From Swiss-Prot:
GO terms for cellular component: cytosol. Belongs to the ThiC family. NCBIfam families: PRK09284.1 (NF006763), PRK13352.1 (NF009895), thiC (TIGR00190). Zn(2+) binds at residues 279, 343. It catalyses: 5-amino-1-(5-phospho-beta-D-ribosyl)imidazole + S-adenosyl-L-methionine = 4-amino-2-methyl-5-(phosphooxymethyl)pyrimidine + CO + 5'-deoxyadenosine + formate + L-methionine + 3 H(+). InterPro entries: ThiC, ThiC/Bza_core_dom, ThiC/BzaA/B. This is Phosphomethylpyrimidine synthase. The keyword Oxidoreductase does not apply. The keyword Mitochondrion does not apply. Substrate binds at residues 80, 109, 139, 175, 195-197, 236-239, 275, 302. Binds 1 [4Fe-4S] cluster per subunit. The cluster is coordinated with 3 cysteines and an exchangeable S-adenosyl-L-methionine. One of its GO terms (biological process) is thiamine diphosphate biosynthetic process. Its cofactor is [4Fe-4S] cluster.
Length: 459
């Protein structure tokens, strides 16, 4: 679809959506997004130009179906997949991608760290994906020197970053906000640094006694990104990994740097979103969202969860979806899903499904709470189907039709029960929705009360 769109742009010094928007140009991607989001083209262009919306759309990802991340668009969900040195292969990752797209992932991140040819799995994922693909390039940078922090140099980082752009990666998590002066702030934490990328950069700075190379070479990265229209996802290396560490000095110091980097990227006309926590008590979520908007000039916020309690391993898709719904309500643009395997192991395809459905619920609930036009239409349609005992319509409108039908059919499997005016919860005689109050019923009741000298029915 996009091959003809991007053909004329290739070779230009800057092909970013932000660059075109600031020139007053509505690209085909902006037009496509406007139709998907039911927004005016002019508003999409203005939001992209302002930096409040991004359209991650690498010119080399030609089978991409463009989408938007920003406060003016619907709340989005990202799904993480990826192979590790201990598990998975290319076929398994493609199966996860297929499931992620099927169950509504708006973007997918390939977080592969080893165990496969990283270029092979990434290229396969990009070629198969209609949604934007994100990566964390420091993983492959370290893998390229066989895990040796000592041998890892600045050029290794930039080489891998450009390779990902060439392959068609739409956004990259760049951990440029972690500075050497932030490291002492970590000492008082309960769980230290929990970001893998942040941990790699911290080790690099401690060994080489030099500033974070992703910070010192940030302008060089911007020059790379604008040639491909790759977007920044500014990584939060110091995100809290437990309730105890939420909103601490380390997290907020890095956030301030991320705000400065946002402006530097914008100066190059490069698109930016900013990553956020993590593990945050419910009473601190609004503060975290507002603080990011303030420090980062309303660049789209992209949060992992946040988890609102730390005591439920195996159920962290639930503990985090609670926080995600709240974060989305307060203005977060994209939610990174958490699966039941979080903190325990690499997710399998069923974990991907469970995590995604939990987060589609959270994002949809946020859109309703934000009074996004049309957000509740599907809810109302399903409710009408429920009231009319239209079981097949209910299944069709569900976020997970297969699960809804499976649960219904466990007790009432025969097709005849798809026309029944009850389910197995209440049975045929006790379903309250069988009580239909008509105008004739109310007229008769009104007359009866009047004849008995009783008070009128309330309006």
């Amino acid at each position: 679809m996009r091959a003809s769109w991007v053909a004329a742009r290739k070779g230009q010094a800057n092909v970013s959506q932000l660059h075109f928007a600031r020139q007053g140009v509505v690209t085909q991607e902006m037009d496509y997004v406007a139709k998907r989001e039911n927004l005016p083209e002019s508003l999409v262009m203005e939001e992209v130009a302002r930096g409040r919306m991004i359209i991650p759309a690498n010119i080399n990802h030609e089978n991409l179906e463009p989408m938007a991340i920003g406060i003016a668009s619907s709340c989005k969900v990202n799904a993480n997949i990826g192979a590790s040195p201990n598990a998975s292969d290319v076929a398994e990752e493609l199966k996860k991608l297929e499931l992620a797209v099927k169950y509504g992932a708006d973007t997918v991140m390939d977080l592969s760290t080893g165990g496969v040819n990283l270029d092979e799995v990434r290229t396969a994922i990009i070629n198969a994906s209609p949604v934007p693909i994100g990566t964390v390039p420091v993983y492959q940078a370290l893998e390229s020197v066989h895990g040796s922090i000592e041998q890892l140099d600045e050029d290794d980082f930039l080489h891998i970053i450009e390779k990902h752009c060439q392959q068609g990666v739409d956004y990259q998590t760049i951990h440029a906000g972690l500075l050497i002066e932030h490291l002492p702030l970590v000492k008082g934490r309960l769980t230290g640094i929990v970001s893998r990328g942040g941990g790699i950069l911290a080790q690099w700075m401690l060994y080489h006694h030099r500033q974070n190379p992703l910070f010192t070479r940030f302008d060089d990265i911007c020059e790379i990104f604008k040639r491909y229209d790759c977007s920044f996802s500014l990584g939060d290396s110091l995100r809290p990994g437990c309730q105890h560490d939420a909103s601490d000095a380390a997290q907020l110091a890095e956030l301030k740097t991320l705000g400065e980097l946002t402006k530097r990227a914008w100066a190059h006309d490069v698109q930016v979103m900013v990553e956020g926590p993590g593990h945050v008590p419910m009473d601190q979520i609004e503060f975290n969202v507002r603080k990011q908007m303030e420090e980062c000039n309303e660049a789209p916020f992209y949060v992992l969860g946040p988890l609102v309690t730390d005591i439920a391993p195996g159920y962290d898709h639930i503990t985090s979806a609670i926080g995600a719904a709240m974060a989305g309500w307060y203005g977060t643009a994209m939610l990174c899903y958490v699966t039941p395997k979080e903190h325990l192991g690499l997710p399998n395809p069923e974990d991907v499904r469970e995590g995604l459905i939990a987060y589609k619920i959270a994002a949809h609930a946020a859109d309703i709470a934000r009074h996004r036009p049309g957000a509740r239409d599907r809810d109302d349609e399903l409710s009408r189907a429920r009231y009319n005992f239209d079981w097949n319509k209910q299944f069709e409108l569900s976020l997970d039709p297969e699960r809804a039908k499976q649960y219904h059919d466990e007790t009432l499997p025969a097709d005849i029960y798809k026309q029944a005016e009850f389910c197995s919860m209440c049975g045929p005689k006790h379903c309250p929705m069988q009580t239909k109050i008509t105008d004739e019923d109310l007229e008769g009741l009104e007359k009866s009360l009047k004849s008995k000298g009783k008070a009128k029915l309330s309006a």
